[in-house]
Swiss-Prot record:
Organism expressing this protein natively: Homo sapiens (Human)
Tissue localization of expression: Overexpressed in multidrug resistant cells. Highly expressed in heart and skeletal muscle, and at lower levels in placenta, pancreas, brain, spleen, prostate, thymus, testis, small intestine, colon and leukocytes. Not found in liver and lung.
Protein name per UniProt: Homeodomain-interacting protein kinase 3
Per UniProt, location of the Glycyl lysine isopeptide (Lys-Gly) (interchain with G-Cter in SUMO) cross-link in this chain: K1208
Any Gene Ontology CC annotation: nuclear body
UniProt KW Cytoplasm keyword: yes
PROSITE patterns: PROTEIN_KINASE_ATP, PROTEIN_KINASE_DOM, PROTEIN_KINASE_ST
Annotated segments matching region Interaction with UBL1: 870-880
Length: 1215
């Protein structure tokens, strides 16, 4: 009995770049080292890969003796006879490959698990490891494995092992094998009722069929088609899979993270299932990375997405029953990293139709109730998911049993024996356990290796890399060595929560096992435990990566959701209304809209769909409100202010129905509208639900003026007219878009960028100036302001993309920044004017300088070292300076040094009280080095009889492969800060520190302001006097003016502060630097007043912790927050200051519940102005400020770890 085989060289299927992973292994386990000889059929080889224009003939054969599911490090035998291939000329070459019982050692890396490989590398499809005993050796088998013993002429320079494929003989005339597999030919056409598909490549073969890569003719879509066997033994399970996929097709596949099935049809009596094409499965991803452990920040989004899928399946009463790395696919590793979907429902079943003693799941991920023959439910999927995340964390299967006995033995040794009540009920308990009755009380014990081998004849083998006595020991494996400070503490806390969740997922008793819904609420997933480290680079990276799993709704959702867009007009008596439907929005893309201003979105910034990497969306409906005064074809009334609002649901594509993996490119004019009435255009997300706020005990009079709004109207409509006097929720802006306006603004948020005006009177090519201002701290017990660090950023119009340059980057460079600011104001505009000590009131009835261009602000051309202290001065125009002093004299008894232009760089007049003290905070800098983590193994590894995989993952939190650029952080260097050593301070470059009041620009006043770097040695600042080695420079930062007119405009522009978890009721002083809280610089607007509400529309009172007193006739003050709880042990590093060098702040989702311990999330009142405040998530090289006047607000990077109310993030990348 000879065997027929075909040998596939390594370059076969080399062109494949992606695969739909639904191929499965046989349900066999080795009963001996050699299988019985079988007859196998011939099959076609992909002729294109051999250079043939047609598939070659069937070829020859040799015999294999391969132990299936062999453990790592064990040997196998192979007998070969001959390999026959057909060349391009048609001649046959017989390659003698005689090998008498060739003894081959299994590879140590890449072959540690007993996997069958059809393809190599990313081309290999995930194969099922259905590991069931080989009770019937005459049953049909398909064996595929990697071999590397073929002759040298079959080897290529790639060095990949050749793949050997075997299949049964006896092909029928209907192109179906004896086992029911359909024999495919390349470029064969598969026809459904609606579409035709051309076969491009073979992707893989499994238990229930095979998968091919196909092209949907007439389109540019590539799909994966699973062709089921027509064998009677697989017919019923195929029908179950089809019915489950039909049920899942009614759900949103992107929202619930499972593969989308398009259609099902019959082709020559074979059922064909059409799926979306996915990129790479997790096993191939691990293999590609040499099976290096993945960091927890990467495991978390994978866990969250798979748990979301399991939660949906559980709600539908479905069991996946084959969850493993091969069945978790990366959608697009390049465009959507760590975005995964669950595939392969070939083993799925309904929970009501489960049968005990059924072999389900791959053996490594098989739940104890399946092994013991207990009744089971959806909990088996949670066990599998626990094994998967443990494998991702270890880089190795947690329980890699070669036999079911080994599997339950590994589980029992690590987690203890199953409960007696489980063993008593299990139908297969006696296979692995024996009951002892000779003792005082009867009990179960695990059979010894000798007893099991004597009963079954199968010898147990050790295949574990790590032998754990407890799951708690998992936290001590692969420790990260390159973390320090708060990053190290955050990593340790993350590991503790990971192990806590893992233990709940791997509970032997299925009734006690955690559910998918509980998993999503676990601290490891929602990252509550990381809130104690808000300024840790590691935590920033965790939140940023976690945001990716929320990016699931995109333009492709229209295929599953037939929702009509809701269009709501602005409810205003002075504004016209417009109602349109989705068809009108579609025509909006193609028509050319004439504009009197620039379009909202510029062609230079590509916008991605909702599933983009940084797009944050969820099931919560979010909207886009476009508020132009007029749209083309609709005449605008010039006699009164006009505005329209168009609401588009997030499921409606804005430009094109592109696939999720394609970025959306919005052309100029798509959102362009015709302007009139000098109104402003805004892009504002409308929030449909808001976290309820606690009842207020103290009321600010200015908030009551805004009036109350119905909760139903919250976030639904915004009136955009000449006077911004409405109330608008302020979201946390996290996506890449910038809208510009040349309007002078005073802001206290972190990113401040003055963009290039669209046009200037002299048509000059102006440069832009950007300042990254770190927010200021407020001292609860004392009225002192602590300086945050800040850094300059160079914006040059000659460079296509500007970048925020940190002090580390600009070391040794000459930096010159010029800002051309065009001021603009409406007639009868009202503003507010104040200096750092006193507030005066005046009105500007006629602002005739609305179009007057401001003079440039020049930074002195001096070397900018890595550490520098910058003094803002205004000594270029003495006459104007004196004029300012004459207009604003301090009323306080103490002389204001800021007003006298003699302010020392380390002394600043308090923004809250004229009699407050002057202080600064010393600062250091911590910059984790982006070095690779060294290979580290645990002590338990010595107990393993298996070799370890070379190398470990490079999971540095600040390296080049981190989603965040390398960032530095200011560490508190007070005396009692234990975790910051003097050695660290000396060896790391210190960050430049300066006290920066609100930067205010005044209409009608033109001044040249010079900013000079005057310090080259950064030392801790000494309270009340200048530090040694520092130059004292006069500064007029406190001499700028604002206009204040009414009690409504005198509202305190306070940034709501979110407390850290664990902050205690203790007055801050110099010895408790880590306990101080952050207060934010209030913003000032020198244009039309636009007030934001604090909380919901009907929330007119401020919270108790926002209560404050006013002084000097209603001068705005900074209101501190009281502490609420005691600090944790990690607190000294948990409350370090943020670094100005952070290029991209952390993204967080509202569901992480980053708020007060009571769950309160506060609104951020921010003064709006038609001027650019770009999103902080914009990359250093992606910002091109060439947009017209628009109102936009960016969230502060100092809010990293704290979401702003409303609690939902924007779905759109440009919101």
């Amino acid at each position: 009995m000879a065997s027929q085989v075909l040998v596939y060289p390594p370059y076969v299927y080399q062109t494949q770049s992606s695969a739909f992973c639904s191929v499965k292994k046989l349900k066999v386990e080795p009963s001996s080292c050699v299988f019985q000889e079988r007859n196998y059929p011939r099959t076609y080889v992909n002729g294109r890969n051999f250079g043939n224009s047609h598939p070659p003939t069937k070829g020859s054969a040799f015999q294999t003796k391969i132990p299936f599911n062999r453990p790592r490090g064990h040997n196998f035998s192979l007998q070969t006879s001959a390999v026959v291939l057909k060349n391009t000329a048609g001649a046959t070459k017989v390659i003698a490959a005689q090998a008498q019982q060739a003894h081959v050692q299994a590879p140590q890396i890449g072959a540690w698990r007993n996997r069958l490989h059809f393809l190599e590398g990313p081309q290999r499809c995930g194969l099922k490891r259905k590991s069931e005993e080989l009770d019937n050796h005459s049953s049909a088998m398909q064996i595929v494995d990697e071999l590397s013993i073929l002759p040298a002429m079959l080897q290529t320079n790639m060095g990949n092992p050749v793949t050997v494929v075997t299949a049964t003989t006896g092909s029928k005339q209907n192109c179906t094998t004896g086992e029911g597999d359909y024999q495919l030919v390349q470029h064969e056409v598969l026809c459904s009722m609606k579409n035709t598909y051309e076969v491009l490549d073979f992707l893989g073969r499994g238990t229930f069929g095979q998968v091919v890569k196909c092209w949907k003719r007439g389109t540019n879509e590539i799909v994966a088609i699973k062709i089921l066997k027509n064998h009677p033994s697989y017919a019923r399970q195929g029908q179950i899979e089809v019915s489950i996929l039909a049920r899942l097709s009614t759900e949103n596949a992107d929202e619930y993270n499972f593969v989308r099935a398009y259609e099902c049809f019959q082709h020559r009596n074979h059922t064909c299932l059409v799926f979306e094409m996915l990129e790479q499965n997790l096993y191939d991803f691990l293999k590609q990375n040499k099976f290096s452990p993945l960091p927890l920040k990467v495991i978390r989004p994978i866990l969250q997405q798979v748990a979301t899928a399991l939660k949906k399946l559980k709600s539908l009463g479905l069991i996946h029953a084959d969850l493993k790395p091969e069945n978790i696919m990366l959608v697009d590793p390049v465009r959507q990293p760590y975005r995964v979907k669950v595939i392969d429902f070939g083993s799925a079943s309904h929970v009501s139709k489960t049968v005990c003693s059924t072999y389900l799941q791959s053996r490594y991920y098989r739940a104890p109730e399946i092994i013991l023959g207990l009744p089971f439910c959806e909990a088996i999927d949670m066990w599998s998911l626990g094994c998967v995340i443990a494998e991702l964390f270890l880089g190795w299967p947690l329980y890699p049993g070669a036999l079911e006995y080994d599997q339950i033995r590994y589980i029992s040794q690590t987690q203890g024996l199953p409960g007696e009540q489980l063993l008593n009920v299990g139908t297969k308990s006696t296979r692995f356990f024996c009951k002892e009755t000779d003792m005082s009380h009867s009990g179960w014990r695990l059979k010894t290796l000798e007893e099991h081998e004597a009963e079954t004849g199968m010898k147990s083998k050790e295949a574990r890399k790590y032998i754990f006595n407890s799951l708690d020991d998992v936290a001590h494996v692969n420790t990260v060595m390159d973390l320090e400070g708060s990053d190290l503490l955050a990593e340790k806390a993350d590991r503790r929560e990971f192990v806590s969740l893992l233990k709940k997922m791997l509970l032997i008793d299925a009734d006690l096992r955690i559910t998918p819904a509980e998993t999503l609420n676990h601290p490891f997933v929602n990252m509550k435990h990381l809130l104690d480290f808000p300024h840790s680079n590691h935590v920033k990276s965790c939140f940023h990566i976690m945001d990716i799993c929320k990016s699931h709704l995109n333009s492709c959702d229209t295929n599953n959701h037939n929702k009509t867009s809701l269009l709501r007009p602005v409810a205003s008596s002075s504004t016209a209304t417009l109602t349109a439907n989705f068809t009108k929005i579609g025509t909006l893309r193609s028509q050319a809209l004439t504009t009197s201003a620039h379009s909202v979105v510029h062609h230079g910034i590509p916008l991605q769909a909702g599933t983009a990497q940084f797009g944050c969306g969820d099931a919560f409906q979010q909207t886009l409100i476009i508020c132009p005064p007029a749209i083309q074809g609709i005449p605008a009334t010039h006699g009164k202010p006009t505005s329209y609002s168009i609401r588009v649901d997030n499921t409606v594509p804005l430009v094109t129905q592109a696939p999720a993996v394609q970025p959306l490119q919005i052309r100029p004019g798509v959102l362009s509208q015709t302007w009139s009435g000098r109104t402003q255009q805004m892009l504002v997300p409308a929030w449909q639900q808001v976290t309820p706020l606690a009842p207020a005990t103290t009321t600010l009079t200015s908030e009551s003026v805004a009036g109350s709004h119905r909760l139903g109207d919250w976030g639904k409509m915004i009136s955009c007219s000449n006077h911004y006097n409405s109330v608008m929720p302020q979201p946390l802006l996290t996506n890449q878009i910038t809208l510009s306006a040349p309007q002078p603004v005073s802001v206290g948020i972190a990113h401040v960028v003055w963009p290039q005006p669209a046009t200037t009177k002299k048509n000059k090519q102006c440069q832009n100036r950007g300042i990254l201002v770190k927010l200021m701290e407020w001292e609860p017990g004392r009225e002192e302001i602590n300086a945050f660090s800040w850094s300059n950023s160079l914006q040059n119009t000659n460079i296509p993309h500007s970048a925020f340059i940190s002090p580390k980057i600009i070391n040794g460079k000459d930096v010159e920044e010029v800002s051309c600011i065009e001021t603009q104001d409406n007639q009868n505009s009202e503003g507010e004017a104040r200096n750092c000590c006193e507030t005066s009131i005046r009105q500007d009835s006629d602002s005739s300088v609305s179009d007057k261009q401001r003079q440039t602000i020049i930074i002195a051309d001096s070397p900018s070292p890595a550490v520098s202290v910058i003094t803002i001065s205004s000594d270029t125009d003495e006459e104007e300076t004196s004029q300012r002093h004459s207009l604003r004299e301090c009323k306080g008894s103490l002389d204001c040094e800021a007003c006298q232009s003699t302010l020392n760089i380390d002394r600043m007049c308090s923004l809250s009280s004229p009699d407050s003290t002057l202080s600064t905070s010393s600062s250091g800098q911590s910059s984790p080095s982006p070095c690779k983590r060294p290979n580290s193994m645990s002590d338990e590894e010595q107990e393993s009889s298996c070799d370890t995989v070379d190398g470990s993952p490079t999971s540095d939190s600040s390296g080049h492969d981190s989603p965040f650029a390398e960032s530095t952080f200011v560490e508190d260097t007070h005396e009692n800060t234990e975790l910051v050593s003097s050695a660290d301070t000396e060896t790391k470059p210190a960050v430049c520190s300066v006290v920066v009041p609100p930067v205010e620009l005044e209409n009608g006043l033109n001044a040249d302001e010079h900013m000079a770097n005057t310090d080259s040695i950064c030392q801790p600042l000494i309270k009340g006097r200048s530090a040694p080695g520092r130059l004292n420079q006069p500064s007029a930062v406190g001499t700028r003016q604002q206009k204040l007119t009414s009690a409504f405009q005198q509202q305190h522009l306070n940034f709501s502060q979110v407390q850290h978890f664990g902050s205690g009721h203790q007055e801050w002083n110099g010895n408790f630097g880590h306990r101080r809280q952050q207060a934010y610089i209030p913003t000032s607007v020198t244009s039309n007043p636009f007030t934001l509400s604090h909380g919901s529309p009907n929330h007119t009172a401020v919270h108790a912790h926002l209560a404050g007193n006013t002084h000097l006739g209603g001068q705005p003050t900074l209101l501190p927050y009281p502490s609420s709880a005691t600090l944790s042990s990690a607190a000294p590093v948990a409350h370090l200051l943020a670094s100005p060098c952070t290029s991209r702040p952390m993204l967080q989702h509202p569901t992480y519940n980053i708020s007060h311990p009571s769950g309160i999330v506060h609104q951020v009142p921010v003064g709006l102005n038609p001027r650019l405040l770009p999103s902080p998530t914009i990359h250093q090289t992606q910002y091109k400020p060439i947009f017209p006047p628009h109102s936009y607000i960016a969230a502060s990077p100092a809010y990293t770890g704290f979401p702003l109310s409303p609690t939902k993030l924007s779905q759109y990348p440009y919101m």
